[in-house]
Amino acid sequence: LYLAAYTLTDQRVVDELIAARDRGVDVAVLVEGGPVGGMTERQATVLDELTAAGVDVRVMTGDAARFRYHHPKYAVADDTAVVLTENWKPAGTGGADSRGWGLTTTSARVADELAAIFEHDTTWQDTPTWEAVREEIETVEAEAATGSYPQHHPPVSTTADNLTVLAAPDNAESALVERINNTDDELLVIQPSIGDRDYRLLRAAIRAADRGVEVRILLSGTWYAEEENTALAEQLRERAADDNVPLNVRVAEENSRFGKIHAKGIVADDTAVIGSLNWNDNSAENNREVAVAVTDDVVADYYREVFIGDWQAGGDGGGFSLLPSDELPTGLVVVAVAVISATALLAKRWLVFAER
């Protein structure tokens, strides 16, 4: 059982990892040693707890680290894998703040590919054990999110065969550009923020609109991103109006469905892409990121429905008429190839994270 994380503080997840280890399962965890703002005291306590239980806890850290940040959010249990946009903490998998997306798949091929990434990332000098670096890492105090949001998007299941693992700094950005370049009808993008107007993936989305693809981009309105996101949205809407192209951008405010946008995904015709990749150069070129692309009508329609509901619930301008409003569910998202928006669902014999 492997779990890859940027941050890890969700006690339910920790308890299940320890329970698996107590059953004799080989359990390994890899986390980022220097997340933005510093490692929290809560996370240090969690890593102590896991180590004491016999879990192999590794930390990506040091001047020789291969990646700027170890930023993926995935888990592998036998031949089942979970890939998330959300961190393993109350605000993310705990359902207490962020809108996120996620996917559970029983594809042995996908599980094997993710396991290979995990093993590659944990077998070098920049991933020492937690015990070895515990005294070197300074921690900070931080309060956990405590919000509560109803879930109105039940999981859906499908038998999708076309799944592709994407990783940065390897193939993720180029694969997404290719996918966007091949989009014919509709492109939906959800991101906390976008690096700048000239970012490669944004340019691909603008080109799609220029050739007639209906493009919608939903960004976060949280305090640390609102000003830049609003400015970008206004620039792109003005450009779309001047050129009369089907491009709209909206900044989502906090609402009854979520506290902030944290999902990183697209729906491009019948393909959905879910993962940790932010739309900026650092994420694509310097971080370890993981995503999965799924070509399947059921999955694409599910995320599309969630996107539209979020667009209508908390935007700052621009209409969206792809579905009548009375057909749209509201609330948090969980999908079982599965979508997850604030709660992690890994349904295999080693782990069960209860939906709430």
Give short role names for the model-derived ranges.
Residues 59-61:
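Histidine-dependent nucleotide/RNA phosphoesterase domain, centered on the 2H-phosphoesterase fold
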Residues 56:
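Short, basic/aromatic beta-hairpin or loop at an interaction surface
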Residues 2-53, 66-70, 76-356:
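Charged, low-complexity intrinsically disordered terminal segments
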